[in-house]
Protein backbone atom coordinates (compact mmCIF):
# COMPACT_ATOMS: atom_id res chain seq x y z
CA UNK A 1 0.00 0.00 0.00
CA UNK A 2 1.23 3.45 -0.87
CA UNK A 3 1.36 5.89 2.02
CA UNK A 4 -0.64 9.01 1.08
CA UNK A 5 1.29 12.28 0.76
CA UNK A 6 0.82 14.70 3.65
CA UNK A 7 2.05 18.23 4.26
CA UNK A 8 2.51 21.28 2.05
CA UNK A 9 1.99 20.99 -1.68
CA UNK A 10 2.45 23.65 -4.37
CA UNK A 11 0.81 23.20 -7.78
CA UNK A 12 0.47 25.85 -10.51
CA UNK A 13 1.67 28.54 -8.07
CA UNK A 14 -1.05 27.63 -5.59
CA UNK A 15 -0.37 26.23 -2.13
CA UNK A 16 -2.30 23.42 -0.44
CA UNK A 17 -1.98 21.43 2.76
CA UNK A 18 -2.73 17.72 2.85
CA UNK A 19 -3.62 16.40 6.28
CA UNK A 20 -4.06 12.91 7.60
CA UNK A 21 -4.59 10.28 4.90
CA UNK A 22 -3.69 12.92 2.32
CA UNK A 23 -6.98 14.78 2.68
CA UNK A 24 -6.83 18.36 1.40
CA UNK A 25 -7.41 20.98 4.11
CA UNK A 26 -10.24 23.52 3.78
CA UNK A 27 -11.08 26.30 6.23
CA UNK A 28 -8.85 27.04 9.19
CA UNK A 29 -5.69 25.09 9.99
CA UNK A 30 -3.60 25.39 13.17
CA UNK A 31 -0.07 24.25 12.45
CA UNK A 32 3.01 24.77 14.64
CA UNK A 33 1.27 27.56 16.56
CA UNK A 34 0.14 29.48 13.45
CA UNK A 35 -3.26 29.72 11.79
CA UNK A 36 -3.81 29.43 8.04
CA UNK A 37 -6.99 29.61 5.99
CA UNK A 38 -7.82 27.55 2.92
CA UNK A 39 -10.61 28.09 0.40
CA UNK A 40 -13.25 25.49 -0.44
CA UNK A 41 -10.97 24.35 -3.26
CA UNK A 42 -8.10 23.93 -0.77
CA UNK A 43 -5.97 26.87 -1.91
CA UNK A 44 -4.12 28.70 0.89
CA UNK A 45 -5.41 32.25 1.20
CA UNK A 46 -3.42 35.45 1.67
CA UNK A 47 -4.28 39.11 2.24
CA UNK A 48 -7.57 40.39 3.66
CA UNK A 49 -10.51 38.02 4.04
CA UNK A 50 -13.96 38.53 5.56
CA UNK A 51 -14.78 35.32 7.42
CA UNK A 52 -17.71 34.78 9.80
CA UNK A 53 -18.36 38.53 10.03
CA UNK A 54 -14.75 39.40 10.91
CA UNK A 55 -11.81 40.71 8.91
CA UNK A 56 -8.61 38.69 9.01
CA UNK A 57 -5.24 39.32 7.42
CA UNK A 58 -3.11 36.45 6.16
CA UNK A 59 0.52 37.27 5.39
CA UNK A 60 1.20 37.51 1.67
CA UNK A 61 4.42 35.48 1.80
CA UNK A 62 3.52 32.80 4.35
CA UNK A 63 -0.26 32.78 4.75
CA UNK A 64 0.11 33.08 8.52
CA UNK A 65 -2.79 34.89 10.20
CA UNK A 66 -2.00 38.20 11.91
CA UNK A 67 -2.98 38.21 15.59
CA UNK A 68 -2.32 39.60 19.06
CA UNK A 69 -1.45 43.25 18.60
CA UNK A 70 -0.61 45.90 16.05
CA UNK A 71 0.26 45.08 12.47
CA UNK A 72 0.68 47.25 9.39
CA UNK A 73 -0.91 46.40 6.07
CA UNK A 74 2.23 45.84 3.93
CA UNK A 75 0.70 47.63 0.94
CA UNK A 76 -0.90 50.70 2.54
CA UNK A 77 1.04 50.85 5.85
CA UNK A 78 -2.29 51.40 7.59
CA UNK A 79 -2.12 50.17 11.18
CA UNK A 80 -4.65 47.65 12.46
CA UNK A 81 -5.11 46.02 15.84
CA UNK A 82 -5.77 42.28 15.84
CA UNK A 83 -7.25 40.29 18.71
CA UNK A 84 -5.55 37.14 19.97
CA UNK A 85 -7.99 35.08 17.89
CA UNK A 86 -7.09 37.00 14.73
CA UNK A 87 -9.99 39.31 13.99
CA UNK A 88 -9.24 42.99 13.37
CA UNK A 89 -10.67 45.47 15.88
CA UNK A 90 -13.33 47.65 14.25
CA UNK A 91 -16.25 49.83 15.26
CA UNK A 92 -15.11 49.77 18.89
CA UNK A 93 -12.98 51.62 21.44
CA UNK A 94 -10.17 49.87 23.33
CA UNK A 95 -7.69 50.92 26.01
CA UNK A 96 -4.24 49.85 24.81
CA UNK A 97 -1.10 50.60 26.84
CA UNK A 98 -2.92 53.41 28.60
CA UNK A 99 -4.38 55.05 25.48
CA UNK A 100 -8.03 55.01 24.45
CA UNK A 101 -8.13 54.07 20.79
CA UNK A 102 -11.26 54.35 18.66
CA UNK A 103 -11.50 52.07 15.64
CA UNK A 104 -13.62 52.85 12.59
CA UNK A 105 -16.01 50.35 11.01
CA UNK A 106 -13.32 49.19 8.57
CA UNK A 107 -10.61 48.90 11.27
CA UNK A 108 -8.64 52.11 10.78
CA UNK A 109 -7.87 54.36 13.75
CA UNK A 110 -10.03 57.42 14.30
CA UNK A 111 -7.79 60.44 14.87
CA UNK A 112 -4.25 60.03 16.20
CA UNK A 113 -2.73 57.93 18.97
CA UNK A 114 0.41 56.46 20.44
CA UNK A 115 0.82 52.72 20.09
CA UNK A 116 3.26 50.21 21.56
CA UNK A 117 4.57 47.47 19.32
CA UNK A 118 7.48 45.03 19.61
CA UNK A 119 9.14 47.00 22.41
CA UNK A 120 8.92 50.44 20.77
CA UNK A 121 6.50 53.38 20.69
CA UNK A 122 4.96 54.69 17.48
CA UNK A 123 2.57 57.52 16.65
CA UNK A 124 -0.29 56.97 14.24
CA UNK A 125 -1.66 59.88 12.23
CA UNK A 126 -4.02 59.49 9.28
CA UNK A 127 -4.09 55.71 9.81
CA UNK A 128 -0.31 55.15 9.46
CA UNK A 129 2.78 55.55 11.65
CA UNK A 130 4.65 58.79 11.04
CA UNK A 131 8.29 58.18 10.15
CA UNK A 132 11.68 59.67 9.33
CA UNK A 133 12.76 62.65 11.38
CA UNK A 134 11.46 65.15 13.90
CA UNK A 135 7.76 65.49 14.67
CA UNK A 136 6.05 67.75 17.20
CA UNK A 137 3.32 66.02 19.20
CA UNK A 138 1.40 67.77 21.98
CA UNK A 139 4.11 70.43 22.23
CA UNK A 140 7.08 68.04 22.50
CA UNK A 141 9.49 66.96 19.78
CA UNK A 142 10.15 63.29 18.98
CA UNK A 143 12.45 61.65 16.46
CA UNK A 144 11.01 58.81 14.41
CA UNK A 145 13.17 56.21 12.68
CA UNK A 146 12.46 54.99 9.16
CA UNK A 147 10.13 52.30 10.55
CA UNK A 148 8.29 54.82 12.75
CA UNK A 149 9.74 53.75 16.12
CA UNK A 150 10.71 56.73 18.27
CA UNK A 151 14.22 57.12 19.62
CA UNK A 152 14.32 56.93 23.43
CA UNK A 153 16.99 57.69 26.02
CA UNK A 154 19.83 58.26 23.58
CA UNK A 155 22.05 60.80 21.88
CA UNK A 156 22.41 60.95 18.12
CA UNK A 157 23.54 63.18 15.28
CA UNK A 158 21.06 64.45 12.70
CA UNK A 159 21.84 67.02 10.02
CA UNK A 160 25.25 67.64 11.63
CA UNK A 161 23.75 68.49 15.01
CA UNK A 162 23.87 66.51 18.26
CA UNK A 163 20.53 65.80 19.95
CA UNK A 164 19.40 64.05 23.13
CA UNK A 165 16.04 62.47 23.94
CA UNK A 166 14.76 61.24 27.29
CA UNK A 167 13.16 57.94 28.34
CA UNK A 168 9.85 59.03 26.83
CA UNK A 169 11.48 60.07 23.58
CA UNK A 170 11.05 63.81 24.19
CA UNK A 171 13.83 66.04 22.92
CA UNK A 172 15.84 67.96 25.53
CA UNK A 173 15.78 71.71 24.79
CA UNK A 174 17.06 75.01 26.13
CA UNK A 175 19.02 73.61 29.08
CA UNK A 176 22.24 72.17 30.40
CA UNK A 177 22.19 68.39 30.31
CA UNK A 178 24.44 65.98 32.20
CA UNK A 179 24.86 62.96 29.94
CA UNK A 180 27.27 60.20 30.93
CA UNK A 181 29.18 62.62 33.16
CA UNK A 182 29.58 65.36 30.56
CA UNK A 183 27.60 68.60 30.27
CA UNK A 184 26.01 69.82 27.06
CA UNK A 185 24.02 72.96 26.36
CA UNK A 186 20.97 72.37 24.22
CA UNK A 187 19.55 75.27 22.28
CA UNK A 188 15.85 76.15 22.05
CA UNK A 189 15.48 73.94 18.98
CA UNK A 190 17.33 71.04 20.61
CA UNK A 191 20.71 70.93 18.91
CA UNK A 192 23.75 71.00 21.21
CA UNK A 193 25.98 74.07 21.06
CA UNK A 194 29.05 73.26 19.02
CA UNK A 195 32.76 73.95 19.53
CA UNK A 196 33.73 77.42 20.74
CA UNK A 197 32.79 79.98 23.36
CA UNK A 198 29.27 80.11 24.74
CA UNK A 199 27.89 83.12 26.61
CA UNK A 200 24.98 82.52 28.97
CA UNK A 201 23.72 85.02 31.55
CA UNK A 202 26.97 86.99 31.31
CA UNK A 203 29.07 83.88 31.94
CA UNK A 204 31.41 82.29 29.42
CA UNK A 205 31.83 78.56 28.81
CA UNK A 206 34.00 76.73 26.33
CA UNK A 207 32.47 73.92 24.31
CA UNK A 208 34.67 71.06 23.09
CA UNK A 209 34.63 69.46 19.66
CA UNK A 210 32.29 66.73 20.94
CA UNK A 211 29.86 69.47 22.14
CA UNK A 212 30.62 68.88 25.85
CA UNK A 213 31.80 71.82 27.96
CA UNK A 214 35.24 72.10 29.47
CA UNK A 215 35.23 71.79 33.25
CA UNK A 216 37.89 72.67 35.82
CA UNK A 217 40.86 72.92 33.51
CA UNK A 218 43.33 75.26 31.87
CA UNK A 219 43.62 75.38 28.08
CA UNK A 220 44.94 77.48 25.24
CA UNK A 221 42.73 79.17 22.69
CA UNK A 222 43.94 81.59 20.02
CA UNK A 223 47.36 81.73 21.71
CA UNK A 224 45.82 82.72 25.04
CA UNK A 225 45.60 80.73 28.27
CA UNK A 226 42.17 80.34 29.86
CA UNK A 227 40.81 78.74 33.03
CA UNK A 228 37.35 77.38 33.75
CA UNK A 229 36.03 76.31 37.16
CA UNK A 230 34.18 73.16 38.28
CA UNK A 231 30.98 74.51 36.69
CA UNK A 232 32.70 75.28 33.42
CA UNK A 233 32.58 79.05 33.95
CA UNK A 234 35.55 81.04 32.68
CA UNK A 235 37.52 82.52 35.58
Residue ranges and their predicted role:
Residues 1-235:
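Extracellular adhesion/carbohydrate-binding repeat motifs centered on closely spaced tryptophans
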Amino acid sequence: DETPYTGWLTLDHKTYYLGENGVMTVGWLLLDGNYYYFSDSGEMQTGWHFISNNWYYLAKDTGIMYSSGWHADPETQTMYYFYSWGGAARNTTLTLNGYRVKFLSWGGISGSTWLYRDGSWYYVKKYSCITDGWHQIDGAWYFMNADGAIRQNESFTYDNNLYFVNNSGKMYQNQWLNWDGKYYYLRSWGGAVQEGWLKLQNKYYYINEDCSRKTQEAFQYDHNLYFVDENGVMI
